Amino acid sequence: LIENKDKALISKKLVTLDNKSPVNKNLTEFKLKEVDKDKLYKFLREMEFNRLLSSAISAYGEPKLSGSENNLKSTEKQKPISNKDYHLITDINEIDEWIEEAEEAGEVAVDTETSSLDPHQADLVGISLCSKIGKACYIPVGHKSQDCLNKDSVINKLKNLLEDPSVKKIGQNIKFDFIVFYKLGISLSSMEDTMLMSYVLDAGKNRHNMDTLSDIHLGHKTISFKEIVGTGKKEINFSEVELETAKNYAAEDADVTF
């Protein structure tokens, strides 16, 4: 303190409020006014304050659009997501239809449900597929005390599709699924990851988990993992989730990712 006395005194002076400074304003003039969203958003974009921009849009809403921009925006809106065309696979032969659909489309969203969030320790509980918007399936292989398909038979059935380089595999954090499948003898090929795409495009703008991306890009609130398994003392393993509930959750994951 003795050595830096001068700096300490300067710092004290800098933080001392001048209560004698003339303020020629009426208190009513300090009342919070309506934000000029367009002006605020323009400034935040110019300064590249992406996190603040995201927070501002969340607080004040989307900016006003011109007529042409509004028309473009309306054409980009997705149809509401429904689970009416989500299917629970109870016969292994039903998988053939989904394989054929994926091969014809040349792309398929793939998602795995497991017993653990650590892919190295996880056991496969189910697989969801989607090659057409609004249509997805869930293949249960590891739900406890419930009728599931034989895991080895399902893996053998899907192996050629998942390793086919001519069919693009789309995933959200697909590294997780890659590890799960690799442990079962499948090496995924031709992969694209929506989480990585989001990070490359908007690294600091928002979070890149599926729930956030669905809300931003599709205007759809997804079923959260916690809604399915619970929290705290009431939390259960995904392998204990009822098949119908698991189907709606897992198929939605694949559909939203696609």
Which functions belong to the PLM regions below?
Residues 16-22, 45, 49-65, 202, ...:
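Non-catalytic alpha-helical coupling and interface elements of nucleotide-dependent molecular machines
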Residues 1-12, 21-24, 66:
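Accessory alpha-helical DNA-binding modules that contact the DNA backbone or grooves
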Residues 12-13, 48, 194:
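Charged catalytic cores and adjacent phosphate/nucleic-acid-binding surfaces used
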Residues 12, 16, 24-31, 54-58, ...:
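Short coil/turn segments at secondary-structure boundaries
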